[in-house]
Structures are given as structure tokens and as C-alpha cells.
Amino acid sequence: MATQHFTNGSATDDGETALEHIIKSLETPTMKCEGTHFDSHVPHTFVIFGASGDLAKKKIYPTLWWLYRDNLLPKSTKFCGYARSKLTIEELRAKCHQYMKVQPDEQAKYEEFWQNHDYAAGSYDQRSDFVALKERLSSLESCNCSCNRIFYLALPPSVFERVTVNIKDICLAERGWNRVIIEKPFGRDDVTSKKLSDHLASLFHEDQLYRIDHYLGKEMVQNLMTIRFANKILNSTWNRENIASVLITFKEPFGTQGRGGYFDEFGIIRDVMQNHLLQILSLVAMEKPTSCQPDDIRDEKVKVLKSIPALTLDDMVLGQYVGNPNGVGEQREGYLDDPTVSNDSNTPTYAQGVLRINNERWDGVPFILRCGKALDERKAVVRIQYRDVPGDIFEGNSKRNELVIRVQPGEALYFKMMTKSPGITFDIEETELDLTYEHRYKNSYLPDAYERLILDVFCGSQMHFVRSDELSEAWRIFTPVLNEIENNKVKPIPYVFGSRGPKEADQKTSENNFKYYGSYKWIGKK
């Protein structure tokens, strides 16, 4: 059944399935928190610019299908793709098909989904093409009533300004709200980001803009606030008196896979650290907001970002992967072997930065951000490492407590602690209190990050989207070191494809009060 994708049909106390409960809540007009519902009976149109591209076929269209299939969109939702490529609906459908995960018993619903689609080919800078698009949207909506429109810009930065001007001048709904979803990159530095933000502010109100960072849609990232502020045992220790250091890690086991040309323009710092990892840091470190309203939360994120000094080169370790002669396939090729990358490129594929927060709660606690490609595993994890126990009586055998929030893969929350080894001796050992989602929540489906975020746009919740002042502070922190790296042509440290990364990164981590014991590996419950 289609509902198995979302909840496996688990029931609430009144007999509703969890999915039915969610659908009902989305249609409820009286909710305590902003952005938790939509008007199901008002027509909505979802317009995808860049509809023929990779992001659209791999993420956007599959996400829209999953939401449509599970009845999580307003009842009268239509979809329209727009790109330069001349495609029929059937050709567009064929491009997307392998990513849609359609089950045999969902075929009728899938046909219905595509019957609600249109597609228009046109340029991104010709006003006449946008006039034609407006006419197609009006025809698709086919009603003389109010209609809400969402515009998703899955586009390269080079066409961004012209497209947004044409949307504003020509394509907005006249009797309904309009919302614009924007994909990164949000500029290359503080200057280009401000230029883009000023341009958007001249066209749209901030409450119409949804700057998407898909990491903010991940289950464990969204869980950070609850972990912190709904548990006194953790909240009361969340400070410099108890926490020694924080390590936020993002690792990918693959290289650029022939797409290094795009990556080479931005590098790992802009691609991952300045956005995904810094957003996680802000949720870990921010003060308690006055409520769960989106702007109360984003206000606190901005406050903590303002307390972080700009990074310098001394705070960084930079690396670039080289081929592994003992590897197989792609592992034998280094970054510079990618034919789309310049032979003398100094672009880092690995970066580690140590950030400091100059406020009362975190003064002296290093926040270590590390990310890289072509490493030994796929993993995103937050490690909150506590200080050593004062007055040790266990002859140096006691290890630090550590709260570990595993973002991906295999969502989990576990707390590393010391216990007596079972048996007749009085030895101690490291173990964990473990909440592994796939075992504790067997009947629950964890939706893809894009599902959560696109649904948030329909509901009008900006809680998990980046505000312009957040973006400004992020670039203030990173622009000086990016300029220093590029102006001085800093050479990254070579590391072997499939390794942990440069050894210098582990040394820098140790210097910043994070102890890596290497004596214990979490494997999750069997």
C-alpha cells in the first residue's frame, strides 16, 4: 500500500493511521505554531525552473511524486516544468523514471500524477518566453479563482537574476501567495552573496524566499532542538564547564566522478562547510529560543553566528585526494586525474576548520568542522565530547563521555559512557546508551530531507530555511580564509583515496582538546 512508504500504517489512539493524522493536521487552519498547515482546497501550482537538469530528475520530481502519492499535497496541485531543452511530458517522465521508486500497486496514482503536469521550453532571459509561460500556467490552473504558486529555481547562478526579474514582472499569481525556493550556491563570498540578497530583496519579501539547505531537512538535524531543550539532563550540561569540544564531521567515500569542473569552481568549504556544517553548529550552539516560531529560532542562530570570529588559515587543514594504487576503479584516480579539472588545481577536496564562539556559554570550547571527499566511509555525525572526570580513581582507564548524533547513514543517538565489565573482575569498559532509529522506530518511515522541506514551503514554514542575515554572517566567517587560500595559492595536503584524510587533521583535532581513543566502534543494535 502507498501509505507504507510513510508510516507503515501505525495507528494513533483514536484509530487513525499516522499518515491520516498527518494529512488531517496539514489541513487544519488553527494550529499553535506558524507554518504547520495549508489550505487544501485552494489550487496550488508548483513551477520547476531547470526541469531538465540533474537536480530536478533526481530529487525534485521524485519528492513531488512521493508527497502526491501519500496525499500530503493540497488536493488541487498542478506541476509545470520549464527549461531550455525542448521536451515532451513523456520524455521528461522517462528522464525521471529510474529515480521515482514506483511500486506496482501505485501505477494508477502515478499516471494521475503525470496527468497534472505541463512543460514549457524557453530561454531564461527572453521576456516573451515568460509571457508564454504565464499563459500556460493560467491554462493549467483552469479556474477563475485564487491560486498559490511556488517557483523552484534549480538553476545555475549565471541565469539567476534574469529569471527572478521575469518571475516577478510576469509570472506571479495575482490572487494568491507566491513563494520562491532557491538552491545554493548563494554566492561565492560576502560580496557576491550580498549582491544576490540585495537583488532578491528588491523583488520579494523575505517571507516569500526559501533558501534551501537540504541538511536542515534531515531527521537528526531537526531533532537537535528537541534533544537540547526538552531534556534537562542534557540542557544543564550544555556549556563550557562540562563540554571539552565539539566535532561535526561530513565524509563521502567517492570523488568528483567526472564532475570536477563544477566542484573545482567552489571547493569543499563552499560546498559543505560554509552551509551544511555551519548550520548544524548554529543549532548545537544557539541559546534557547523564546518559542518554536521560525523567526524566534532563526534569531538565535544569527546571534550565535555573530559571536564567531572570522576563520584564518591557522585554523584550517586543507587536503586534496590522490589515487590509491591499491584501490579499485575510481579509487585509483586522484582529483587531478579528473578530465574536467585543471592539472594545477589547488582546490581542496578536504577541509577542517576550528571555530570559536565568544560568548559566556562556549568561551574556550573549540567547534571542529571537518568534511571531505574520497574518504574511508560515508558518514555525517556530531560528537559532543565532555570533559575528563576530575579526581580520576581508575588509573587513567576512564575515557570521556560523548554524546553522538548520527545524521547519516542509519540515524541514531547514543551516549558513550564507562561501566564495569561484566564478570568477577573490577575492570571498566566503554559502552553506550543507544537509540538507533531503525530498531526503536521500526514502523516509522523517515522521509527524505527534500520531502520535509518542500512540504514546509507549501505550509509556509521557514524554520528550516536560511534567512538573509544568517547567510551574511556565514560568509563573514568564511570569506577571509577563502580569499587567503585563493590569493596565496595554498597547496592542499595530499591524502590517499579511501583514507581518513590528512594526518595533520587528526593532529589539529587533538591540539584542540578532542580525544580520539580508537578503542571503541559503535555498530548499532543487531
Curated annotation (Swiss-Prot):
InterPro entries listed in its UniProt record: G6P_DH, G6P_DH_AS, G6P_DH_C, G6P_DH_NAD-bd, NAD(P)-bd_dom_sf
Pathway recorded for this protein: Carbohydrate degradation; pentose phosphate pathway; D-ribulose 5-phosphate from D-glucose 6-phosphate (oxidative stage): step 1/3
Top-level division of the source organism's lineage: Eukaryota
Residues involved in NADP(+) 1 binding: 50-57, 84, 184
GO biological process: glucose 6-phosphate metabolic process; glucose metabolic process; NADP metabolic process; pentose-phosphate shunt, oxidative branch
SUPFAM superfamilies, per the entry: Glyceraldehyde-3-phosphate dehydrogenase-like, C-terminal domain, NAD(P)-binding Rossmann-fold domains
Reactions catalysed according to its record: D-glucose 6-phosphate + NADP(+) = 6-phospho-D-glucono-1,5-lactone + NADPH + H(+)
Similarity field: Belongs to the glucose-6-phosphate dehydrogenase family.
Protein name: Glucose-6-phosphate 1-dehydrogenase
Source organism: Ceratitis capitata (Mediterranean fruit fly)
The organism's taxonomic lineage, starting at the top: Eukaryota, Metazoa, Ecdysozoa, Arthropoda, Hexapoda
